[in-house]
Amino acid sequence: MQIKLANPRGFCAGVDRAIEIVNRALEVFGPPIYVRHEVVHNKFVVEDLRSRGAIFVEELEQVPDDVIVIFSAHGVSQAVRTEAAGRGLKVFDATCPLVTKVHIEVARYSRDGRECILIGHAGHPEVEGTMGQYDAVNGGAIYLVEDEADVASLEVRNPESLAFVTQTTLSMDDTSRVIDALRKRFPAIGGPRKDDICYATQNRQDAVKQLADECDVVLVVGSPNSSNSNRLRELAERMATPAYLIDGAEDMQKGWFDGVERIGITAGASAPEVLVRGVIQQLQAWGATGADELAGREENITFSMPKELRVKSLL
């Protein structure tokens, strides 16, 4: 059995920044540091931060007064920001800047009284945060659609004053079809020049397609609640390549690789490389050889830290 590695894979700039914000807050201010929602959707990362004093909560009502709170990479609604400000909580915002870009678009449509359609998965924290950027005070509304069937049944108030945005971690292929359906149903709809799916999601989806084309089975390292990791598994399966989403080496079953010659490994944007290395080691213990990385797109994007953490970390 031969191992092939997707390139790029694993952490993106937004995840790197979010984790580093929690790390630096712990270093500068000491525990406990409260984090609203899992800072990124990865069990290993969350448990590591929890062991060092991060406390993860789902709502601000679980947070005591006079503590530091960090908003997760997925972003939060305006109502959550207002609640935090009203309580005087000290907040560091780990929202991915590419998610913030979508928030700004939604807020602008709201101010203009333009209705908005969000393409995304119901219940995902990024979707909840983005929906919560829209203020209906000007008479508009925001709608959520997941697929073409949702578009077909959608009724809006004013189809002549309508725009769309997308969740950043969707399947590019699926999203393209939904956008086509929106443009066909609502010819006057506006939106970004391209969808809002982020560079890291696009690059990892392109890489897993190459991996699935060259391999007999694909392993996606990522947690079950990670949207972008699930999309990678689905893409491989659509190419008729068996694919498994695993948190780490302990989730693998040796029988998956009976008769397999080439094993492909990738990782979602919130999965650390140490987990990939663990998977490789286990496969090699089962007789796999090599760990060749495919040619891919280089990523050199970085996002800046909040100023207070950036300055204090140098003292």
Swiss-Prot record:
The keyword Repressor does not apply. [4Fe-4S] cluster binds at residues 12, 96, 198. The active site is at 126 (proton donor). Pfam families: LYTB (PF02401). Coiled coil: none annotated. InterPro entries: LytB/IspH. GO terms for molecular function: 4 iron, 4 sulfur cluster binding; 4-hydroxy-3-methylbut-2-enyl diphosphate reductase activity; metal ion binding. The keyword Hydrolase does not apply. Its EC number is 1.17.7.4. Its cofactor is [4Fe-4S] cluster. Pathway: Isoprenoid biosynthesis; dimethylallyl diphosphate biosynthesis; dimethylallyl diphosphate from (2E)-4-hydroxy-3-methylbutenyl diphosphate: step 1/1; Isoprenoid biosynthesis; isopentenyl diphosphate biosynthesis via DXP pathway; isopentenyl diphosphate from 1-deoxy-D-xylulose 5-phosphate: step 6/6. (2E)-4-hydroxy-3-methylbut-2-enyl diphosphate binds at residues 41, 74, 124, 168, 226-228, 270. Dimethylallyl diphosphate binds at residues 41, 74, 124, 226-228, 270. Binds 1 [4Fe-4S] cluster per subunit. Isopentenyl diphosphate binds at residues 41, 74, 124, 226-228, 270. It catalyses: isopentenyl diphosphate + 2 oxidized [2Fe-2S]-[ferredoxin] + H2O = (2E)-4-hydroxy-3-methylbut-2-enyl diphosphate + 2 reduced [2Fe-2S]-[ferredoxin] + 2 H(+); dimethylallyl diphosphate + 2 oxidized [2Fe-2S]-[ferredoxin] + H2O = (2E)-4-hydroxy-3-methylbut-2-enyl diphosphate + 2 reduced [2Fe-2S]-[ferredoxin] + 2 H(+). Keywords: 4Fe-4S, Iron, Iron-sulfur, Isoprene biosynthesis, Metal-binding, Oxidoreductase. GO terms for biological process: dimethylallyl diphosphate biosynthetic process; isopentenyl diphosphate biosynthetic process, methylerythritol 4-phosphate pathway; terpenoid biosynthetic process. HAMAP family: IspH. Catalyzes the conversion of 1-hydroxy-2-methyl-2-(E)-butenyl 4-diphosphate (HMBPP) into a mixture of isopentenyl diphosphate (IPP) and dimethylallyl diphosphate (DMAPP). Acts in the terminal step of the DOXP/MEP pathway for isoprenoid precursor biosynthesis. Belongs to the IspH family. This is 4-hydroxy-3-methylbut-2-enyl diphosphate reductase. It comes from Pseudomonas syringae pv. tomato (strain ATCC BAA-871 / DC3000). The lineage of its organism: Bacteria, Pseudomonadati, Pseudomonadota, Gammaproteobacteria, Pseudomonadales.
